[in-house]
Amino acid sequence: MRIHAILFSLLCARALGAQTFLQMSDPQFGMYTKNQGFAHETVNFEFAIATANRLKPAFVVVTGDLINEPGNLSQAAEYQRIAAKLSPAIRLFSVPGNHDVENEPTPQSLASYRERFGPDYYSFRVGDIAGFVLNSNLEKAPQHVAEEAAKMETWLKGELAKAREARVKHLIVFQHIPFFLKEPDEEDQYFNIPRETRLRYLKLLHQYGVHQVFAGHYHRNAGGRDGDLEMITTGPVGMPLEEGRSGMRIAIVSDSGVRHKYYDFGELPESLAEIK
């Protein structure tokens, strides 16, 4: 009986891990010291990656501001050095933030990001999850890269249609800047996407059955709903603002939906089984 119980536990853990992911945001190497170093960020991100290796999720997504100073090679190298410590069994998806591609992206800043980190928007599939990584600064400030912004939006429509045709159960969007912090019709500000673009994207996401958007940028936790779409804004792995604390979000995906909770570094569970 004991052997059966152990096998059952292992099978449950495997199933859980296949539908579990960690969201980390804003490691932002260099923020604590205004680009004079990144020792604090190194400690935090090392701990975050070690935690991921212990918890063994299916994947980790880092929702932007990988570095603090656009184009800073030493900051980028440190992010990649630590990220490379993630177990090969756990997939890693990096998302561009405004500090990675500049507040107003240019063809040059996009090219620099792509050369260093890879595509700035793309899709992926893990089990019953179809993930869509977006470059939110193409939504926020496309004035210098209008063609790229239009290209991403057209691409997203096509990818969402493919996922729906394939009957993927969970379609989830990951980007850096949240569409909104609390209300879908809130006023434009630094921490959200301009209303005209926001509402257009939200309409598209509703059309294809997207129920979750995970973002960062705010360096604190926030969230709201637009009907059955949940906007989840996650606090930082790196430096928090105001009442925020460094940590990460754990998401559990099942037939009944997506459950998630933000954990400060001091309150992380020992295993995923604790939060089933």
Question: What role is predicted for each listed range?
Answer:
Residues 163-183:
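Short acidic, glycine-rich surface-loop motifs adjacent to enzyme active sites
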Residues 8-17:
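Hydrophobic h-region of N-terminal signal peptides that target proteins for export
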Residues 172-179, 211-221:
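Histidine-centered catalytic micro-motifs
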